[in-house]
Amino acid sequence: MKLNDLRDKPGSVKARKRVGRGIGSGTGKTGGRGVKGQKSRSGVSINGFEGGQMPIYRRLPKRGFTNIFAKSFNVVSLGRIQAAIDAGKLDAKAVVNLDSLKAAGVIRRAKDGVRILSDGELKAKVAFEVAGASKAAVEKIEKAGGSIKLPEAAAE
């Protein structure tokens, strides 16, 4: 059997029914839409309109707000950092920070800083200078013999 011999099973793929193409086709004239009215016409449905019933977006109350001072961090796991070190993309002897992670291709776009999470294992002794880290990540870094420098009140 060759790739060019492969065929779909008969009846498994139905041809698309073209509507509104003459009465002989069975779906000509009104094309399965019935007769007249808003639903028979094209492009006239009103988004969110529920036929006069109070729409869901007005029945439910407004909630929350967008904090314009919120910081967005690049989240990186210890496993990804170890993989970059093993691949030779990241130097374990140099300080690991936002710039070095970006240069190594671990993160794509730099945001307000890097936050390290404890997923995976860290075997290398690494010095970090980052915006945040989880408690478990700090423990794993110190257990591996590394150090971590965080801004005040960033370790949570």
UniProtKB/Swiss-Prot annotation:
Residues 1-11 have a biased composition (Basic and acidic residues). Binds to the 23S rRNA. Residues 21-35 have a biased composition (Gly residues). GO terms for molecular function: rRNA binding; structural constituent of ribosome. Residues 1-44 are annotated as: Disordered. It holds the Pfam family Ribosomal_L27A. Belongs to the universal ribosomal protein uL15 family. GO terms for cellular component: cytosolic large ribosomal subunit. This is Large ribosomal subunit protein uL15. Transmembrane segments: none annotated. Gene3D superfamilies: 3.100.10.10. Keywords: Ribonucleoprotein, Ribosomal protein, RNA-binding, rRNA-binding. GO terms for biological process: translation. InterPro entries: Ribosomal_uL15, Ribosomal_uL15/eL18, Ribosomal_uL15/eL18_sf, Ribosomal_uL15_bac-type, Ribosomal_uL15_CS. Part of the 50S ribosomal subunit.
